[in-house]
UniProtKB/Swiss-Prot annotation:
It comes from Aggregatibacter actinomycetemcomitans (Actinobacillus actinomycetemcomitans). SUPFAM superfamilies: Ribosomal protein L16p/L10e. GO terms for cellular component: cytosolic large ribosomal subunit. It comes from the Bacteria. One of its GO terms (biological process) is translation. PROSITE patterns: RIBOSOMAL_L16_1, RIBOSOMAL_L16_2. This is Large ribosomal subunit protein uL16.
């Protein structure tokens, strides 16, 4: 599972998921999976989608993960009264804005890449679309 090796602070404020995305172009591979909606991906979801893609391409080609879960999400235990401080870190998420390229792929045909990204998209909570590298 992806998570930072070390952080400056253990816990962060909830914040808001606004603004525009960086990393909107396919830069490493030939094909990409781009987010259309806004949301957050957990480390488990990122890994599940990666595994689905890897199996679909039968370990051919190369896959790049363009998102990293760097925000800790805390939860309080069940049946605990409010107050008494912030809960413990339970999992890590990556905040996703529309236009962000989530995964990239190279070394496979377009139809295999489309199939693999469709399987990966089914594992993700944000709407996505298939994109190809634009050559200038």
């Amino acid at each position: 599972m992806l998570q930072p090796k070390r952080t400056k602070f253990r816990k962060v404020h909830k914040g808001r998921n606004r603004g525009i995305a960086g990393g909107t172009e396919v830069s490493f591979g030939t094909f990409g999976l781009k987010a259309v909606g806004r949301g957050r991906l957990t480390a488990r979801q990122i890994e599940a989608a990666r595994r689905a893609m890897t199996r679909a391409v039968k370990r051919q080609g190369k896959i790049w993960i363009r998102v990293f879960p760097d925000k800790p999400i805390t939860e309080k235990p069940l049946e605990v009264r409010m107050g008494k401080g912030k809960g413990n870190v339970e999992y890590w998420v990556a905040l996703i804005q529309p236009g962000k390229v989530l995964y990239e792929m190279d070394g496979v045909s377009e139809e295999i890449a489309r199939e693999a990204f469709a399987l990966a998209a089914a594992k993700l909570p944000v709407k996505t679309t298939f994109v190809t590298k634009t050559v200038m």
